[in-house]
Amino acid sequence: DSFDQKYFAEECLSFQFTDGSKQVYCDWKKDGHGYVDFHQAIQKSVNIYFWEIALKIWRLYENDEKESLLQNYARDLGFGDYTGIDLPYERKGTVPDRELFDDWKITAPDRVREEGWLGGDLMNLIVGQGAITVTPIQVANAYANLIRGYTLSPRINIDYSASNSDLRVLRVDSEFKKMFLS
């Protein structure tokens, strides 16, 4: 009916996948966010912005080696691997891709659809949903790596008698504070 059409037109994005299936995605904010850039999309958690990126990657690179662009970036940030933190029982987490889904079809068929890896899985991945699994320390470390511009393994300082010379002052840009902490 017309109410449904108006609702979808004003509050949702409709994507047409290359396989012909139609998916409708709604944003969490009823009235939407208007036009946003990358920084605003992160700050306001605008999934639709990131879904658009994933969908572009899917449409351009489906079944191509570049299809794993997002996964490679996630791995560069430290997801899907051990951080090297000096604590026991650390988990690697999972960064899903076509190969993993193909493997799961055989080894864990209850974890994946018969169709395997689809564009919607990439859209889930980019917003941290679906088959991706991460640990809190991986998330914290990924943000730290982004801020630093290089990677380090996190450490737990259990020596409370450390001198002040062992402490490193972290200066955070005021624009960064404004963007992420407001």
Q: Which residue ranges define each predicted feature?
A:
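Beta-lactam-recognizing serine transpeptidase/beta-lactamase-like catalytic domain environment
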Residues: D1-S182
